[in-house]
């Protein structure tokens, strides 16, 4: 299902005691790069590719962020940086993808139970930098992502999606009580993605 909300239904961000979510821009390249490279080992499992390579550069990251910023402005998908309250350190990233995105078109999506993929409007992915896992920033972010889309967005259902290879995040999501609704197998990916509600 494509995104149906109007511009006024896309939040400019969210501020909590622990972090700030705001649309990512190319100007975030350096702090985002620091978070990405600190977390690169587990991001490769989360992404199920070789990204980020050990020789990934700030400039290459800036190019990626320019694309994400364009996609956000065009309302095709929405990417938010997760910053500490002082906005001096990037803590991670959140991605809202429409459930009719190209990556899903070629995937084998298998329901676990009686849910239908087309009843959900967004697939939400997120990661938190490695040094913030021990402070449970990932759990605090997950708690926000369970309620924020229903409260401040006009989404008709959303799923929290992660890679089965990212076992730390899978365990954290399941301990939070979310239920597995779908498995998603993308061609040329070594593992499945798991979609929770």
Which ranges hold each PLM region?
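GNAT-family acyltransferases
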Residues: 1-131, 148-197
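Conserved acetyl-CoA pyrophosphate-binding loop and the N-cap/start of the following alpha-helix
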Residues: 132-145
């Amino acid at each position: 299902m494509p995104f149906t909300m109007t511009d006024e239904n896309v939040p400019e961000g969210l501020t909590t005691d622990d972090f700030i979510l705001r649309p990512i821009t190319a100007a975030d390249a350096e702090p985002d790069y620091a978070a990405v490279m600190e977390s690169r080992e587990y991001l490769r499992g989360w992404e199920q590719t070789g990204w980020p390579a050990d020789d990934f550069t700030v400039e290459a990251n800036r190019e990626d962020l320019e694309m994400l910023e364009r996609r956000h402005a065009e309302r095709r998908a929405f990417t938010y940086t997760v910053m500490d309250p002082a906005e001096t350190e990037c803590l991670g990233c959140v991605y809202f993808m429409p459930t009719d995105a190209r990556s899903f078109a070629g995937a084998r999506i298998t329901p676990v139970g009686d849910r239908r993929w087309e009843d959900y409007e967004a697939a939400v992915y997120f990661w938190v930098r490695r040094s913030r896992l021990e402070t449970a920033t990932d759990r605090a972010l997950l708690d926000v992502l369970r309620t924020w889309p229903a409260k401040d967005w006009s989404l008709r259902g959303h799923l929290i999606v992660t890679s089965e290879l990212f076992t730390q995040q899978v365990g954290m999501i399941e301990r939070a009580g979310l239920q597995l609704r779908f498995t998603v197998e993308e061609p040329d990916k070594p593992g499945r993605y798991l979609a929770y509600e």
